[in-house]
Amino acid sequence: GQILSIGRVQTPTLALIVKRQEEIDNFKPEPYWVLATIYRDTQFTATKGKFTSKEEGEKAFSTIEGKPFTITNVTKKKGTEQPKQLYDLTSLQVDCNRKYGYSAEMTLNTIQSLYERKLTTYPRVDTQYLSDDIYPKCPQTMNGLFQTTFAGKRPYAELVKTLGGKPLLKSKRVFDSSKVTDHHAIIPTGIPPQGLTDVERNVYDLIARRFIAAFYPDCKFATTTVLGEVDKIEFKVSGKEILDKGWRV
């Protein structure tokens, strides 16, 4: 059989990916029914949840069919979403598996190759933070990303350009020396990559975009929730409106 390195950092990921695959393989979809109504071109769904039998759903529907729908409450809440934390090995393996279907071992081999070519930092890490002494080097790394070219295009130029002309944001979610021991989170070195395979490029791209996003402001949004009722049965719809994309650009 194959020998897999079960290190302190790697075990949870392999277990996580294997467990997830087992869940997918063993998943048996079960049919269910929900009560829904259209009001002013918007679908509202009953808050009482799912019906496991069609008869049960039809019975509930028959009690409200043809009765008037009334809006009972409208609330609007503002919220923010912070940029995702930088990658450690585990979170990178999970994202590569989720987005590209790469195994934990494949991601590790790829990131090891990028590290050996001095394109990304040391990969076998279990921290998502940078030490404070890395901050002064970040503009230089950004400059390298700005110049990076893949197939005649510069995928990071616009993202980096938006951050130009002002000091980079220094967040405690990114820079915290107390959370770093021997090695820090995985980031690009700033050396523009050349001759990457498709797999290498995909892994590099995740790391580069995560690094750039760490210096962007929070994404700001508003969530509107509207409640209505028909004959004491409550219906609800929620919508999210982005007010300022921030790092989600």
Question: Across the structure, where does each feature detected by a protein language model lie?
Answer:
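Core catalytic DNA strand-manipulation module of type IA topoisomerases
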Residues: 1-249
